[in-house]
């Protein structure tokens, strides 16, 4: 299986205005493939909206941006196909009643059915079942290793319910699920929310490792770590409630995938 190929990200005077005002504006980015990009700013400053816009899930209204070979907003679908999201409230929520193994199996099945090219989708049912199962296992094992999640270390292994995971374990699982599709760009929201200093350090070490392996990472945070490409969102008059409403409206238009 081919390794991930990170996507370069550029933006100039990038902005998004909704019916309630600007979610963000005047954003500039210049990051090469395999970069760790930290979107830093206070809550309510449009950080999540910027993350969703750069991954083709919200439509920008000002300026220009490119993600790999996709120009935004004209080629949002291409940006969506090349990227994946993790730990985004309301978008990638884990089901607390399902186990870790069930989440991973579901994602592998979805990837097999919808994640490849049209040619792969048509060929998939014709491949031997053992071959398909082996590829799915390889994807899962590779994603778990990259996310630093050891199933054997969990209370009940793969049968551990999501509701029983620690906060950091749940974040690692969300990242692993996103990596099953081997995206060129990984977007992670709220990387440092409600985490201790030690846990934050673990998360940044994880995201730096993923970036070093080739996948470009865009991470929303309160404070950017050393060595990251720092992108700031400008505070607006929005409240968090308003920001959440605009995010929901945009996702209803473009889809959550």
What are the roles of these predicted feature ranges?
Residues 89-169:
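ABC-family P-loop ATPase nucleotide-binding domains
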Residues 55:
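Helix-to-loop junction immediately C-terminal to a conserved catalytic motif
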